[in-house]
UniProtKB/Swiss-Prot annotation:
Subcellular location: Cytoplasm
NCBIfam families per UniProt: HAD-SF-IIB, HAD-SF-IIB-MPGP, MPGP_rel, PRK03669.1
Organism: Escherichia coli O81 (strain ED1a)
Family named by the database record: Belongs to the HAD-like hydrolase superfamily. MPGP family.
Name of the protein in its database record: Mannosyl-3-phosphoglycerate phosphatase
One GO-annotated biological process of the protein: mannosylglycerate biosynthetic process
Active site: 13 (nucleophile)
Enzyme class: hydrolase
Keyword Methyltransferase in record: no
Amino acid sequence: MFSIQQPLLVFSDLDGTLLDSHSYDWQPAAPWLSRLREANVPVILCSSKTSAEMLYLQKTLGLQGLPLIAENGAVIQLAEQWQDIDGFPRIISGISHGEISQVLNTLREKEHFKFTTFDDVDDATIAEWTGLSRSQAALTQLHEASVTLIWRDSDERMAQFTARLNELGLQFMQGARFWHVLDASAGKDQAANWIIATYQQLSGKRPTTLGLGDGPNDAPLLEVMDYAVIVKGLNREGGHLHDEDPAHVWRTQREGPEGWREGLDHFFSAR
């Protein structure tokens, strides 16, 4: 068992978890965000989104200054007080966005895979795809270590594409709405472990960890947490963990921020 009073880190996915998949509403989670902030419990956002997008969301959610995990773990935005850490303000894993883009353009040109990346379109098109404002959509294009795309080919071709990327040291990952290409060495789990180790080094004690996510791409993150909340997903398969001991893993009945709140209620309110 654990409590909100002990050293604790909360790691949370965004779309479909803390944010509603369509409206991006987070208000159902607001009371718990306030309570965690008052208790000095860091809420560390983890997403496929760019660091620029997530810094904007951090401010909106009242979480500014905390570390975050962007681009599925390929980018770690460091906490404001970690200025002495090499790489401040961000640590980037693997090859850059530009290098990945070159690989994808070559595969598309020579092997005729069909897909559209966020680099292929303008912010107005992304706003139409996502429901974001144009200014927010522009932030989605500021990738540093990954590429976001829409797959427009067959499942058979996708398998071939994935294999080619793997040969080149890259991975192909499904998100809530889009697909993402990033370095094979990057991941939300590795990034989370690095952040946990940093907090442990600074405080002298390993914090207890709670993670929340809704999709298969969140499973690696949840696997390295002490406690996990699998938020009910909308029209997609939820994550599956190797060990779903009910004492440590809770599957919600509600979706999005309602499920996020349900998960916090389950692990804290009953204790």
